[in-house]
């Protein structure tokens, strides 16, 4: 992850609200994996700034590589992304068998055999499999056998892809929760990114199960009576799901580290990113202070930064890492605009 910000972002000119807390997460993920990522995007803010016809902010690099993005419905996005993963898995399995056939052929040259073997050795590694794929295609290009021609014809499916499912808290905590739970429980190598604004942002700021107790918003004008649903704890209860809670403005290093670890983990992962929204009604400057609001949320103890890495448990280490420090409660005020008072 060192030097990640020198990489080309494959998300640009999104048209999101000025200061949006969601787009920095998506932009960062495209910098890390954009040349080989698939995105299934739930309906909501992230699908509006993510693809408002006839334009899309997702772009390509100099090689013509970029995120493959699609949107189904609000309620089935997790299942939709899961289907994308299974389809890619099935195609790659067939292509792998064809590469094995070529590698075992007596007619294959030493160069072709070496390229095939390197591809097979890196088959499950997204970082190294891309270069191995380029070498394989170059070695097979021009070969006359039907198997080689089919491999080259389907070259876009050869490299290991990074499968992502994007959506907001209204989708992940409420309407699409059943699908999110199903996908995480599957044990498959898939990544879920939740842009947590703690309300239904795209439809005007209604309360969701991600809204915290006391939060004032539509359908909760007197303050939400029930506490926030702990999606992270639910996912951690499985024991084999990588889970992280991040806030890019508060701790960029932790955010980048967790995103990289989640993608590298050979199983399901869930990342919940705190995303201030203009509907939060941030005083004195509004979304100019988006990143500062993330810092305040973490410093006060309102939003904790942590990760749960099952790979550490297998190595005999504590899988849970708490990055944020003890909260400073003096930063939290009673929600009374005329007389805000510290709660401690």
Please name every model-derived segment:
Residues 159-165, 174-190, 195-329:
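Glycine-rich ThDP/TPP pyrophosphate-binding loop and its adjacent helix/strand module
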């Amino acid at each position: 992850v060192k030097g990640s910000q020198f990489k080309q972002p494959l998300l640009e000119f999104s048209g999101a609200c000025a200061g949006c807390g969601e787009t920095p997460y998506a932009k960062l993920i495209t910098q890390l994996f954009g040349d080989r990522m698939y995105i299934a995007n739930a309906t909501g803010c992230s699908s509006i700034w993510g693809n408002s016809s006839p334009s899309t902010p997702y772009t390509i690099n100099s090689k013509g590589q970029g995120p493959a993005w699609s949107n189904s419905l609000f309620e089935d996005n997790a299942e939709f992304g899961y289907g994308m993963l299974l389809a890619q898995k099935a195609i790659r399995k067939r292509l792998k068998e064809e590469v094995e056939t070529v590698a075992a052929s007596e007619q294959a040259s030493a160069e072709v055999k070496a390229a095939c073997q390197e591809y097979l050795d890196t088959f499950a590694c997204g970082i190294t499999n891309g270069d191995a794929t380029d070498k394989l295609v170059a070695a097979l290009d021009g070969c006359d056998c039907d198997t080689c021609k089919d491999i080259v014809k389907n070259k876009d499916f050869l490299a290991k892809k990074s499968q992502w499912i994007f959506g907001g808290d209204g989708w992940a905590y409420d309407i699409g929760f059943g699908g999110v739970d199903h996908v995480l429980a599957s044990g498959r190598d898939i990544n879920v990114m939740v842009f947590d604004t703690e309300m239904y942002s795209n439809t005007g700021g209604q309360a969701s199960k991600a809204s915290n107790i006391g939060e004032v918003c539509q359908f909760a004008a007197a303050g939400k009576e029930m506490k926030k649903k702990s999606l992270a704890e639910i996912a951690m209860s499985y024991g084999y799901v990588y889970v992280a809670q991040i806030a890019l403005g508060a701790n960029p290093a932790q955010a980048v580290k967790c995103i990289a670890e989640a993608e590298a983990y050979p199983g399901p992962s869930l990342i919940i990113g705190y995303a201030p929204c203009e509907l939060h009604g941030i005083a004195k400057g509004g979304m100019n202070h988006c990143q500062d609001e993330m810092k305040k949320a973490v410093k006060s103890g309102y939003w904790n930064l942590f990760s749960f890495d099952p790979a550490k448990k297998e190595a005999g280490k504590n899988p849970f890492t708490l990055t944020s420090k003890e909260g400073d409660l003096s930063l939290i005020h009673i929600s009374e605009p005329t007389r805000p008072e510290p709660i401690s």
